[in-house]
């Protein structure tokens, strides 16, 4: 029943979101980047190498990386120190902001949605994961304005670990 699920979620500290809240977070999820790039390296006579296509990125991220735990804290008013904290990745969660990329970046970091996923060098407003904002700032993006921050005090690396182990075991047994 519903109460049983709510108790399990509380016990595991998994947040229960309303539809409106889920829609806000969904703005930060864009799917994977797909584009054609030519990888070129001229080997010297004594060198050898190999190209490895990584197709298991999602399981690796789910196994090793941090996920939010518990309920978020919402910020709507900001001081200068909040801009610095966002830039340094001190808020773990989601950031709604106006951001300006540098003009000399070959591979823009932050996408926006049109008919397709677009990575451009235009100033834009959007909701992104805090680690994406930190990476963008490391590459020269400038936060123009903060509108909303939803961050989590607690994180865990164990949210999907058992799930990935289980599917990896099935995959290995069937190969």
Model-found features: residue ranges?
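Conserved acidic
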Residues: 1-175
């Amino acid at each position: 029943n519903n109460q049983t699920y709510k108790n399990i979620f509380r016990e595991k500290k998994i947040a229960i979101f309303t539809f409106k809240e889920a829609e806000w977070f969904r703005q930060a999820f864009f799917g994977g980047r797909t584009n054609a790039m030519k990888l070129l390296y001229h080997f010297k006579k004594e060198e050898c190498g190999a190209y490895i296509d990584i197709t298991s990125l999602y399981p690796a991220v789910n196994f090793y990386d941090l996920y939010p735990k518990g309920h978020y804290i919402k910020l709507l008013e900001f001081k200068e120190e909040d801009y610095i904290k966002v830039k340094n990745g001190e808020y773990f969660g989601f950031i709604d902001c106006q951001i300006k990329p540098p003009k000399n970046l070959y591979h823009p970091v932050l996408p926006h949605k049109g008919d397709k996923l677009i990575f451009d060098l235009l100033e834009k407003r959007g909701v992104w994961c805090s680690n994406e904002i930190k990476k963008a700032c490391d590459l020269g993006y400038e936060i123009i304005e903060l509108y909303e921050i939803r961050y989590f005090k607690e994180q865990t690396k164990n949210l999907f670990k058992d799930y990935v182990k289980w599917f990896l075991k099935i995959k290995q047994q069937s190969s």
